[in-house]
């Protein structure tokens, strides 16, 4: 009998304890669906838009920002892209005056905005080219800035550059030039007289490259100076009253790669 009574009392105590726990922990109603949806939307909107971020650091985006920051009325033409090292970003510094603009193009391992102060630090970005565009009072004045030469009429020792193109060599003061014409362009390679083969080799490489690539169409002429010693690569062409100059390019064939992107 005592065992039955004790079991009954233990069962009653368990029921009372369970009821007490239930009263102390009331059910918390679920949040309304609209509130949950609102919070999810807020969290989603706070995430960065990956597509916009990527678009802002593409070459097209960088070049658009370049043109926007120039704030010039000069009718200059910029390319859609430039040849840069894989895995790097294109950026630039800009400077504009009434009749002249200067753009220094850089490649960097990190994304740097146009005209970022960090571009003054050589270890943060590398100069790949400088573009200078200047407007003259007339097309005749602009044409005087182009060192155009018809090499077939200038004399010099004839040399075969391939692709049915003849070059003409001229030496003086320790320098050896190999020049030729392609359309409205006058192109010449420069080397030292103690390394004459290098000038012809570079000229042949340039001719072969231009077999499948087009330089900008000048109005009226253009000139290219390609240096074996990588110290004075210069490409200049006229577009009516405007004169485009590309320099600060170390490798001569890279200078041609930079120039062809201005073809349109």
Where are these regions (language model features)?
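Short, surface-exposed beta-strand/loop micro-motifs that present aromatic residues
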Residues: 174-180, 232-238
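Internal helical hairpin/lid segments
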Residues: 178, 188-189
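Short, isolated positions in well-ordered beta-strands
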Residues: 165-167, 187, 244
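Short Gly/Thr-rich strand-loop-strand
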Residues: 143-172, 204-231
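Surface-exposed amphipathic alpha-helical segments
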Residues: 194-220, 240-264
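N-terminal, intrinsically disordered, polar/charged segments of Gram-positive cell-envelope systems
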Residues: 3-12, 20-128, 136-149
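Mixed-charge (acidic/basic) macromolecular-recognition segments
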Residues: 183-185, 193
